[in-house]
Amino acid sequence: MYERIRFTEYLDLDLNDEHWYCHDCGTKLISARESYKKGCLVAERRPHEIHNPVIEGEYSFAPDENWVRILEFYCPGCTRQIETEYLPPGHPITVDIEVDIDSLKARLKKGVIVIKDGKLTKPEAEVLA
């Protein structure tokens, strides 16, 4: 049995059932062999809702919605915002985390790395050396 690994501020990986979880509420999002974003609620925001114009006129220093779209990814359990993405219109959602689960499990089994307090680290003997 493995302890959950804290991958980001709001995202945990459980190697026992190979799923992504919300760190805040523990909601199971999706298989860790897929992008965690597929297990999230997604909100598309218009740039002017988030970035108020700095000056009046055409060149306001606010992003142009013809050039950028903003996607926000939320936990379906507690609605914690997990990630935000700025993409060109029509661009597919990016895959920003791809874990080689089989390799990670093999390294943990061999003792090359260990999970301590939710973090991947080297075994104590190597840390002290």
Swiss-Prot record:
Give the cofactors, semicolon-separated: Mg(2+); Mn(2+)
**What EC identifiers does the entry list?**
6.4.1.8
Molecular function per GO: ATP binding; ligase activity
**What's the record's note on cofactor binding?**
Divalent metal cations. Magnesium or manganese are required for activity.
| ATP-binding listed as a keyword | yes
Q: Which GO terms describe its cellular component?
A: cytoplasm
Just give the chief location class.
Answer: cytoplasm
Activity regulation, in the record's words, is: Inhibited by zinc ions, carbamoylphosphate and beta,gamma-imido-ATP.
Assigned keywords, A-Z = ATP-binding, Cytoplasm, Ligase, Nucleotide-binding
Which cysteines bridge via disulfide bonds? Answer: none
> What's the domain of life for this entry?
Bacteria
Enumerate the catalysed reactions: acetophenone + hydrogencarbonate + 2 ATP + H2O = 3-oxo-3-phenylpropanoate + 2 ADP + 2 phosphate + 2 H(+)
Q: What's its job?
A: Catalyzes the carboxylation of acetophenone to form 3-oxo-3-phenylpropanoate (benzoylacetate) in the anaerobic catabolism of ethylbenzene. Also carboxylates propiophenone at the same rate and 4-acetyl-pyridine at lower rates.
Partners and quaternary state? Acetophenone carboxylase consists of five subunits; a heterooctameric subcomplex of two alpha (Apc1), two beta (Apc2), two gamma (Apc3) and two delta (Apc4) subunits assembles with the epsilon (Apc5) subunit in an unknown stoichiometry.
Q: What is this protein called?
A: Acetophenone carboxylase beta subunit
Q: Which organism is it from?
A: Aromatoleum aromaticum (strain DSM 19018 / LMG 30748 / EbN1)
Q: Species lineage, top-down?
A: Bacteria, Pseudomonadati, Pseudomonadota, Betaproteobacteria, Rhodocyclales
Which gene name belongs to this protein?
Answer: apc2
